[in-house]
């Protein structure tokens, strides 16, 4: 779609009442979305979880993001109409499309793709024009998620971050390139970007591996930015990749650092976090003296921060989505006594609304040029919508499950509940580029094992507890393992061991003592091997060429009627 046609459709949408924001007049169209008057004396720009998406993409937000216990009905566990109502967003317009799955296919065709570093660069420059001292912070998961990032070990994204003007970052998936590669990148390639993580220490003497924080002065305001890497990296990923490092939330150490930077004169303390939003919300109640948490990991695009009270006052907790789809803009008025006021906008990056920054576009073209033929090779065409996000399954994950069962001859298949991965509309070609968007990891091996029904239930219970444990500190983010070929029931309200029931294969109960052939991928054990997942799926795609709409293997969810995290 050409930009002129997009603007025409946008104007028509506004005329029909689908305003860019509540109360917008009919005459306002494209420019209104990014009108952002400056406020205060400190501005923070925030991106997170871009997952190496250099080009604009389609990305469908989840229709299932269940919150339980205290998180039920609270951000970020709101989807669809419940999210719109909570944040006062008018249905049917650009904001509704950006933040929800509602009418996704039609809205995606109307408004076009989102993100892309060339378009993001234009938006960053536009916002910085009225905020010349704004700091751009990257919450991590930037070096992983695409073919070129995997093939260059993140070097393509380091170049893009530097060109974008990122000043500070923390990390998660970056560590899956291995400790040696991360140290090489931080020590030799990343400058002038500062890499900070207070919760990564050596296993032997608990020495800090990276700088825990950085001190800045913006418009005469001394401030500190503390880094919080993903606390469960060695659990969620192969331990051998960072065997000499320990992680964890380490909120007591964090409190010591907050006190330390306050003693050094910081009037504003920011935590650049990759905890996940639920963990950040709990942490904000336990650690005093943090003014702002700019969070990531769980990919929650939340239109407004949550204000959390604690012994030291209040903490703003914000989360800025994923895949380069959003730019968070936080303007603060900081006085001698602390934060006196703030304004926050989570700006969707619509590629049709923002011109591509020429310098960034040239850089991206240079990154892709050596691989272009391989990346753009068409493997199949999809007749249905392909997407990943959702607590239990997505159609692209179903495609991966179907491929695993077919190619490896399995009765049941498991696929990790990753939250990264882009979307494709009906009629789109599935290229190798798109396939790698779903599978580009450093431990892509596929497996075929024999598990008993008892073992299968234990696996599902373990992952389900990670997702639905009522204590956020015992959640690791991500979604439920995707299950192909087998149905089951899930009651998120129960404790571990009692959430999974009624497992069936071909309509018959799964027997606890019988063995079943189970295919999977992404094993975390050292020494694992097997054909990479992208080869398995490519074999399946080439055999089919035209992909019928996927029928999702979904559990029967118990006890969640009326939960606003379930559409």
Stretch-by-stretch model annotation:
Residues 3-11, 17-352, 359, 391-403, ...:
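Acidic, metal/ion-coordinating pockets
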Residues 30-43, 47-69, 192-198, 211-213, ...:
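Feature captures C-terminal
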Residues 46, 285, 319, 367, ...:
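Short, functionally important structural connectors and interaction interfaces within domains
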Residues 81-82, 95-99, 333-430, 439, ...:
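A short C-terminal boundary segment appended to hydrolase-like catalytic domains
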Residues 122, 126-129, 184, 256, ...:
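Charged/polar, solvent-exposed surface patches and flexible loops
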Residues 222, 385-386, 487, 509:
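Short, solvent-exposed loop/turn motifs
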């Amino acid at each position: 779609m050409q930009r002129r046609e997009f603007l025409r459709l946008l104007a028509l949408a506004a005329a029909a009442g689908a305003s860019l924001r509540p109360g917008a007049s009919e005459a306002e169209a494209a420019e209104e979305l990014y009108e952002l008057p400056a406020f205060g004396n400190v501005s923070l720009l925030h991106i997170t979880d871009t997952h190496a998406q250099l080009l604009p993409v389609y990305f469908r937000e989840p229709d299932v993001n269940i919150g339980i216990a205290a998180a039920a009905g609270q951000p970020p566990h709101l989807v669809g109409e419940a999210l719109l109502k909570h944040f006062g967003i008018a249905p049917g317009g650009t904001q509704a499309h950006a933040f929800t799955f509602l009418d996704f296919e039609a809205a995606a065709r109307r408004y076009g793709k989102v993100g892309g570093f060339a378009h993001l660069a234009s938006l960053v420059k536009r916002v910085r024009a009225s905020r010349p001292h704004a700091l751009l912070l990257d919450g991590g998961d930037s070096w992983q998620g695409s073919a070129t990032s995997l093939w260059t070990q993140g070097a393509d994204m380091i170049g893009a971050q530097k060109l974008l003007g990122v000043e500070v970052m923390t990390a998660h998936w970056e560590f899956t390139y291995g400790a040696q590669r991360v140290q090489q990148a931080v020590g030799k390639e990343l400058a002038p970007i500062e890499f900070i993580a207070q919760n990564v220490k050596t296993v032997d003497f608990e020495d800090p591996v990276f700088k825990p924080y950085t001190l800045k002065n913006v418009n005469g305001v001394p401030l500190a930015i503390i880094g919080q890497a993903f606390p469960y990296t060695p659990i969620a990923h192969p331990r051998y990749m960072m065997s000499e490092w320990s992680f964890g939330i380490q909120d007591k150490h964090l409190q010591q650092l907050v006190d330390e930077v306050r003693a050094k004169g910081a009037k504003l303390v920011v935590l650049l976090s990759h905890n996940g939003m639920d963990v950040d919300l709990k942490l904000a109640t336990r650690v005093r003296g943090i003014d702002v948490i700019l969070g990531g990991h769980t990919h929650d695009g939340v239109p407004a921060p949550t204000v959390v009270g604690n012994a030291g006052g209040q903490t703003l907790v914000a989360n800025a989505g994923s895949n380069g789809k959003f730019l968070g803009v936080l303007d603060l008025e900081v006085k001698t006594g602390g934060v006196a006021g703030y304004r926050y906008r989570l700006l969707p990056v619509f590629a049709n609304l923002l011109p591509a920054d020429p310098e960034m576009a040239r850089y991206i073209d240079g990154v892709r040029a050596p691989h272009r033929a391989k990346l753009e090779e068409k493997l199949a065409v999809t007749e249905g919508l392909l997407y990943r996000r959702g607590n239990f399954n997505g159609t692209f994950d179903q495609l991966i499950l179907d491929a695993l069962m077919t190619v490896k001859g399995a009765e049941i298949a498991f696929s990790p509940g990753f939250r990264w991965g882009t979307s494709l509309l009906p009629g789109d070609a599935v290229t190798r580029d798109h396939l790698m968007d779903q599978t580009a990891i450093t431990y892509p091996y596929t497996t075929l094992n024999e598990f008993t029904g008892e073992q299968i239930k234990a696996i599902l219970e373990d992952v389900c507890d990670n997702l639905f444990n009522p204590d956020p500190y015992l959640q690791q983010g991500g979604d439920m393992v995707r299950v192909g070929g087998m149905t089951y029931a899930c009651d998120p309200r129960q404790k571990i061991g009692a959430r999974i029931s009624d497992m069936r294969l071909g309509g018959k109960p799964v027997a606890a003592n019988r063995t079943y052939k189970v295919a999977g991928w992404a094993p975390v054990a050292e020494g694992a091997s097997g054909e990479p997942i992208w080869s398995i799926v490519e074999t399946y795609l080439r055999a089919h060429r035209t992909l019928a709409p996927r029928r999702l293997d979904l559990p029967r969810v118990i006890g969640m009627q009326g939960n606003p995290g379930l559409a």
